[in-house]
């Protein structure tokens, strides 16, 4: 499922028929992939919790977001460390051993609903200087809800594509077109700017 529902996108361009639904869906998929690549992250939530490993360079803080990992649901989250560098995260941290950032889920844009992107150690220290990734976090990764600015950016990209679709042939190349559209539309670029991570695709300014 795309971030923007097909019915919502069609309302934006004044369409209510189903004649071009397949093409519209392909375009929305292309816009979504271009947004994900531009931002270096995806804006949906994993169905179930999975474990991920991280290298940590600061004994007090683990920057998950810098490694394209954010947590949209902390229910059942497990933090564990490999303290002896044997490849097994045998030390499970208690809830009081760390806290999460951003505080209260408030992001740099002042909006709530941002996912966890950093862990701050309180009762313990993160192992650093290890040969193996020393931090293991089990959680549901991603965003609990797609941010409204991202939804607006996708709607705007779809509307821009719709205006030009008569001059485009075939259903391929959507992602490349949308990548260029993001670069060329300052309003879209500004909407997505707060959501770019350090893993955003190089060259997608």
Where do the language-model regions lie?
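Divalent metal-cofactor coordination and adjacent catalytic microenvironments
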Residues: 1-205
């Amino acid at each position: 499922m795309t971030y923007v529902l097909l019915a919502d996108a069609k309302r934006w361009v004044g369409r209510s028929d189903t004649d071009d639904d397949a093409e519209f869906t392909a375009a929305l998929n292309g816009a979504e992939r271009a947004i994900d690549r531009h931002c270096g992250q995806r804006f949906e939530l994993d169905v179930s919790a999975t474990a991920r490993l991280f290298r940590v360079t600061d004994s007090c803080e683990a920057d998950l977001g810098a490694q394209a990992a954010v947590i949209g649901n902390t229910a059942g989250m497990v933090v564990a460390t490999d303290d002896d560098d044997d490849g097994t995260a045998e030390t499970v941290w208690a809830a009081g051993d760390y806290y999460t950032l951003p505080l209260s889920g408030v992001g740099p844009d002042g909006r709530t609903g941002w996912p966890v992107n950093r862990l701050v150690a309180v009762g313990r220290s993160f192992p650093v200087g290890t040969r193996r990734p020393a931090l293991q976090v089990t959680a549901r990764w991603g965003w609990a809800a797609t941010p409204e600015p991202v939804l607006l950016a996708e709607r705007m990209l779809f509307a821009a594509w719709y205006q030009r679709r008569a001059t485009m042939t075939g259903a391929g190349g959507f992602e490349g077109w949308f990548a260029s559209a993001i670069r060329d539309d300052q309003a879209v670029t500004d909407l997505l700017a707060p959501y770019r991570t350090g893993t955003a695709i190089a060259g997608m300014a």
